[in-house]
Amino acid sequence: MASFKGFSANTVPVSKAKRDISSLAATPGLRSQSFTPSVDMSQSREFLTKAIEQGSMSIPYQHVNVPKVDRKVVSLVVRPFSSGAFSISGVISPAHAYLLECLPQLEQAMAFVASPESFQASDVAKRFAIKPGMSLQDAITAFINFVSAMLKMTVTRQNFDVIVAEIERLASTSVSVRTEEAKVADEELMLFGLDHRGPQLVDVSDAKGIMKAADIQTTHDVHLAPGVGNIDPEIYNEGRFMFMQHKPLAADQSYFTLETADYFKIYPTYDEHDGRMADQKQSGLILCTKDEVLAEQTIFKLDAPDDKTVHLLDRDDDHVVARFTKVFIEDVAPGHHAAQRSGQRSVLDDLYANTQVISITSAALKWVVKHGVSDGIVNRKNVKVCVGFDPLYTLSTHNGVSLCALLMDEKLSVLNSACRMTLRSLMKTGRDVDAHRAFQRVLSQGYTSLMCYYHPSRKLAYGEVLFLERSNDVTDGIKLQLDASRQCHECPVLQQKVVELEKQIIMQKSIQSDPTPVALQPLLSQLRELSSEVTRLQMELSRAQSLNAQLEADVKSAQSCSLDMYLRHHTCINGHAKEDELLDAVRVAPDVRREIMEKRSEVRQGWCERISKEAAAKCQTVIDDLTLMNGKQAQEITELRDSAEKYEKQIAELVSTITQNQITYQQELQALVAKNVELDALNQRQAKSLRITPSLLSATPIDSVDDVADLIDFSVPTDEL
């Protein structure tokens, strides 16, 4: 990504300078101070991007003085399981300063990372393996990338011990021992001249050794890559551009060895030994759109076993020449764009973590640009992007190459403001359609004549003869180049003859230029002695490493046995799932863990039954007492109910008696009332007939009686007597 060079470290914005001048004029003798609030640029990237797009010249910034850090040189010894130990040294960056506190654990972890064969031939382990010649910082970077890709974890001081334990758990128990005559088994690396075996002593005492020395002198100089962080930017970007055009051998193989090897294991390649297209086993990744037709972008037959798999088949015998996993850009690009803004991991990040070379079609590039989600799709450090999946299609049409290169330079927000016309021309030009139509006419040409463009032995000239002179008639240009390509089958034979002639010339020169071959005999004998001594030391070192590995295995076994003995005799009823995870963390064998958990389950069941029986026995007495009390209370309740029924009967009898008495009393009262009425009537008749004076009724004087006036006058008139 291009860097913004609008301001240097001491540059002052124009508006700020004008404001300072005006303040000096208004207040002489005083030093002007900026009233613009300081902004931390590391946390204001969106503000800076917006200011650049709008062409603003006034951007507040803050100058931070970074203190100097005294970094010491640290040396570590890495002991791979399948080769000899080697030392790496260098300084540790301040961001990884916490590693100084755990150097022994770091050496232990690096031993596993330097032994990719311990992880069941994982491609990720091979890609991030630590090799001799690396600097310490490059080895730490490889270790961090290994942890991120294999364990999906981030290296921190808090979880460093957990990471080391997890790496040991993943590593296979079988450790391969390096033999004296180790050979590289990867036929692809040997085929493409990318073998980087360790240095070996060459005996030049005979003609065979001299021929071998001459062969080594004629080969290109190859050195180990110092790591991505130390690659010259021009070399790195040149290599990415070559991969983009399907020209991996044109990149500097000192840095892109692994990527080139993966490329020729994925994409269609012509095998000169078998005389046909190689049968590829490794699968690649294609980012494409849902509506494009992939069959129109290759000269091979296209077979789709399922919705996510694409096979390229040879047109002669239908064997598989390339395998790809198809991923639709519409499904992953929007989510990846949102994940970048939120700082999360996307599906596309997981796909990129498992490969080094990917393919993206021209239509997919245009789709991400059109929808504004192109950031982080092609500009990745850990993958090399190839436009298209058929090398011949990309080499002949160049569809999408310019657009992909533009997206590798800047983010889309910057391109929309600074390179809008260029972006418009790449999105709306009709040249891609014309080249695509011309390529369809190529499919009708001879299939055998096109095989030379998939021949890896053409080295840097791979694909260069296509369209050397571009004419207005694209179809005629393709036909001319196809006619010329039919003469390229003799090139490998001629190159082999040239190499043999060079070997003969060098051998003759070495023999003729040696005036005193006898003088070299002592040196050669000394060289042979040193070689035998080195071989003996290597064998002793190998035996020592084997004994050391056996001792470490015995120690681990003893620790495991002691722990197993304790766990077997320890009585516990804890059968929680977390307990099984803790036993797994201390590396207890799965069968032992299963036996322990089953035993705990049985003990827990026994204790539950025992506690149930004791509780039942203790509660039985109380239950009996309560039962007896319940019986007594039931009897009392029965007696009370009988008494209540008896009382109810008595009450009913009393009520009946009272009712009868009331009736009797009522009758008697009615009789008395009637009798009273009768007597009253009789009294009235007698009163009318007899006049009774008060003096006759009482001997008491009338005056001495109170309320005499209220008394009834019973006097009877005398005339009625």
Curated annotation (Swiss-Prot):
Q: Which domain of life is it from?
A: Viruses
Which parts of the sequence are marked as the site Important for the formation of viral factories?
Answer: 570, 572
Where does this polypeptide localize? Host cytoplasm
In this chain, the stretch annotated as Interaction with sigma-NS covers 1-13
GO-annotated cellular components: host cell cytoplasm
Question: Which parts of the chain are coiled coil?
Answer: 522-559, 628-684
What does the entry's free-text domain comment contain?
Answer: The C-terminus is involved in the formation of factory-like inclusions.
Family from the record: Belongs to the orthoreovirus mu-NS protein family.
Q: How does it assemble?
A: Interacts with mu-2. Interacts with sigma-NS; in viral factories. Interacts with the inner capsid proteins lambda-1 and sigma-2, and outer capsid protein lambda-2; in viral factories.
Stated name of the protein: Protein mu-NS
Q: Which species?
A: Reovirus type 3 (strain Dearing)
The gene it comes from is: M3
